[in-house]
Amino acid sequence: MAAYKLVLIRHGESTWNLENRFSCWYDADLSPAGHEEAKRGGQALRDAGYEFDICLTSVQKRVIRTLWTVLDAIDQMWLPVVRTWRLNERHYGGLTALNKAETAAKHGEAQVKIWRRSYDVPPPPMEPDHPFYSNISKDRRYADLTEDQLPSYESPKDTIARALPFWNEEIVPQIKEGKRVLIAAHGNSLQGIAKHVEGLSEEAIMELNLPTGIPIVYELDKNLKPIKPMQFLGDEETVCKAMEAVAAQGKAKK
């Protein structure tokens, strides 16, 4: 029998997801379709009778708005919310704002897959002459970060390394206190949590395509280890299509 339950949800489609661009730390909002995804995710949680005690999320609006939409759907908008940059999306450095398919056509799908799917290979850094450099690095929400904390690029390994301290120091104690926790975040930061919880290999985590807007449920034992694989609150066809869409983002258009 599970000692705890943990629910994760990846933000709905953003405007830059719609345009197939590397979103990174740019603060893209939800697209209309992404808002509908979040509403459906919230309705799935409502239909399943989920209640929560605390929510944790990033400082990026696409996931904050996803969380708002979910909380509205389950009529729990009063819940406390902890926001942290440590749950932000991976920083894609110099690839930020580039169209993924066009980048694949230019550099080859193999190179884009290395940038997107290699565990410890970072993309090119975001240089000061990048059009979104100031937009991100000078944003006041990051004013308290040290130079070492504010990245100019990240590999998935780097993203996981900055998310895990928050998991260990903030999330784990809440779960062990018996609080029902909802984490709304991004693909790469949620991959980091999944890798840690399930003990997945570097290769396995990079092939994990988490769908947007579909709640993910873990049933955990007293040591916070899963007693069964992650479960998706959605019909199988919808989940598979959503995962396939994520996997196809780095491919050149035919």
UniProtKB/Swiss-Prot annotation:
Site (Transition state stabilizer): 186
Keywords, comma-separated and alphabetical: Acetylation, Glycolysis, Hydrolase, Isomerase, Phosphoprotein
Catalytic-site annotation from UniProt: 11 (tele-phosphohistidine intermediate), 89 (proton donor/acceptor)
Pfam short name (any one): His_Phos_1
Reactions catalysed according to its record: (2R)-2-phosphoglycerate = (2R)-3-phosphoglycerate; (2R)-3-phospho-glyceroyl phosphate = (2R)-2,3-bisphosphoglycerate + H(+)
InterPro entries assigned: His_Pase_superF_clade-1, His_PPase_superfam, PG/BPGM_mutase_AS, Phosphogly_mut1
Database matches in SUPFAM superfamilies: Phosphoglycerate mutase-like (SSF53254)
GO molecular-function terms, A-Z: bisphosphoglycerate mutase activity; hydrolase activity; phosphoglycerate mutase activity
In-chain residues carrying the UniProt-annotated modification Phosphotyrosine: 26
GO BP terms, alphabetized: glycolytic process
Binding-site positions, substrate: 10-17, 23-24, 62, 89-92, 100, 116-117, 187-188
Phosphoserine: modified positions: 14, 23, 31, 118
Gene3D superfamilies: Phosphoglycerate mutase-like (3.40.50.1240)
Other noteworthy facts: This is the product of a processed gene created by retroposition from mRNA of an expressed gene. This gene seems to be expressed.
UniProt similarity note: Belongs to the phosphoglycerate mutase family. BPG-dependent PGAM subfamily.
Name under which the protein is recorded: Probable phosphoglycerate mutase 4
UniProt source species: Pan troglodytes (Chimpanzee)
